[in-house]
Structures are given as C-alpha cells and as structure tokens.
C-alpha cells in the first residue's frame, strides 16, 4: 500500500504517458483529488501464475485499505503487460472478480504496454471514512 502523494502522482503520470490499448486520460485523473492510496503489484512475466499472484497482492492491499477506511469511493486501475506475457483471456475473469468484489462507487481502467519483464497492476484508490465527508 502506497500513501506517499509524490509517488502516487508519479504513478498517475505513468498511466497517462504509457502507450495504451485502453487509455487513462488527464481528465480521468482530475477526478482523483484527495484521500489517495495506491497499490503497485508486480510479478515476473515468466511466472505462469503471474496474474493470479498480482491479484492476490491486490486483494491483500484492498483488505488493508478497508480495515482503515470505511469506503472506497473511486478506483483508477491500470494493467501493465509485457509483450512476452500478453494477458490471457483466462486471466480476465479473475481480474473482473476482483473489481466486482471491491465496494466502490465508480472506477475507470486502462491497459498498456510495460517495458519491464513483469506483469504489473496499479490501482489508485480514493478512500474515505464514513463518519466524515473528508477523504483521507
């Protein structure tokens, strides 16, 4: 789980600048203002269970966030993939199950090409406490 605002801003900038199949735009990012927490989960693309392991890491981060915050208002999800791995169609139901199990009001996602040798998924969450209108 990442809470450092500068690191999160760098991650958001990467989302916009990465060559994409499904694009995240600057307008999408403008909707994420405060209370930002991020997950940056990676696994070597050579691992046949790479995407499964990434989802397991994301699931742990999601649970950690919900242990501290009452709700996740928004999610910005970016799936990075290497040319060597190329997300398999059978990876996608697992990913959709993860997204469906996050109690979230809205989300936007993108898919882009990653230069590294890892499968990587970055999620920026806007989380809030239920007893406050403020985001944390």
Go through each PLM region and give its residues.
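Tubulin/FtsZ superfamily GTPase core signature
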Residues: 1-136
């Amino acid at each position: 789980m990442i809470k450092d605002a500068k690191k999160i801003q760098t991650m958001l900038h990467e989302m916009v600048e990465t060559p994409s199949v499904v694009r995240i735009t600057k307008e999408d990012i403008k909707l994420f203002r405060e209370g930002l927490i991020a997950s940056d989960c990676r696994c070597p693309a050579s691992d046949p269970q790479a995407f499964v392991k990434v989802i397991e890491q994301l699931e742990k981060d999601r649970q950690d966030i919900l242990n501290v915050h009452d709700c996740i208002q928004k999610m910005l999800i970016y799936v990075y993939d290497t040319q060597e791995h190329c997300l398999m169609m059978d990876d996608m139901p697992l990913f959709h199950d993860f997204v469906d199990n996050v109690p979230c009001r809205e989300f936007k996602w993108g898919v882009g090409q990653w230069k590294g040798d890892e499968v990587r998924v970055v999620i920026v969450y806007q989380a809030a406490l239920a007893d406050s209108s403020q985001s944390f």
